[in-house]
Regions:
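Signature of uroporphyrinogen-III synthase
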Residues: 1-256
Length: 256
């Protein structure tokens, strides 16, 4: 694609990351990109004895995000648990990269960076009688555990972090939303969309609901339910998100 995004402002609703591939791709095409984290990440209490025992005897560990890698291994180290020969899985390439870069672990991961992709991995087909541990944040989808249980696995959640509202960015974000010109927000989860909706409601309801780039139909359904118009990417991979923006944005769309 050679499409230009000149004139478009993009607000990514998460913390700025060094070398963020999505921000870099959109900036290279001429977009003005800013990051506004609506949610902060907090570690949860240390693993209890029962969960530590389940992790220690597990036949596989599954990490569903970079945050799960960071906070999960902090808790594993505190509990004296280190990976030996246990197979380790990641939801996608970015999470696998975090495991490799932070811990030197080569994780198996699908090309389709989501629950459905994980469930297609050959290593997770015949799991009858196995114990698997999913490292994740509080809440979220239950589809992965349900799918593995249907195949006969015993599945435990290790919820190592939680998301909490990050209110200090709200004035700056509200000002950015009110500025004139083409605007697109990037929301990677339903949780972020709900936080955005609450922010707009606190702004007396007069602010229009912006268009939001989202990864997949599930998050798009949440966006519609909250009154946002979704631009739907095939997945959360930076290349797929970029493609969706380029399909959606043309300067002609915003000419009056």
């Amino acid at each position: 694609m050679t499409a230009s995004l000149a004139g478009l402002r993009v607000l990514i609703l998460r913390s700025a990351r060094p070398g963020d591939p999505l921000a870099a791709r959109l900036t290279a095409r001429g977009a003005e990109v800013h990051s506004f984290p609506l949610l902060a990440i907090e570690s949860r209490p240390a693993l209890d004895a029962d969960l530590s025992a389940a992790v220690a005897k597990a036949d596989g560990w599954i990490f569903v995000s970079r945050h799960a890698v960071r906070h999960g291994f902090e808790q594993l180290a505190a509990a004296g648990l280190v990976p030996s020969r246990v197979p380790i899985f990641a939801v996608g390439a970015a999470t696998a990269a975090a495991l490799r870069e932070d811990w030197g672990i080569a994780a198996r991961h699908p090309s389709e960076a989501n629950t459905e992709g994980l469930l297609k991995l050959p290593e997770l087909q015949a799991v009858q009688g196995q114990t698997l541990v999913i490292f994740r944040g509080v809440g979220g989808r239950d589809a992965l555990r349900a799918g593995l249980r249907e195949r006969g696995a015993s599945v435990h959640y290790c919820e190592v972090y939680r998301r909490v509202p990050e209110r200090r960015w709200e004035p700056a974000l509200a000002a950015a939303l009110a500025a004139p010109g083409p605007l697109l927000l990037v929301a990677h989860s339903g949780e972020v969309l709900r936080a955005l909706s609450q922010l707009l409601e606190r702004a007396d309801g007069s602010m229009p609901r912006p268009v939001c780039l989202v990864p997949g139909e599930r998050v798009a359904d949440i966006a519609r339910g909250l009154g946002f118009e979704p631009v739907i990417a095939a997945s959360a991979l930076a290349a797929k998100m970029e493609q969706a923006v380029c399909r959606w944005y043309t300067p002609e769309r915003f000419r009056t």
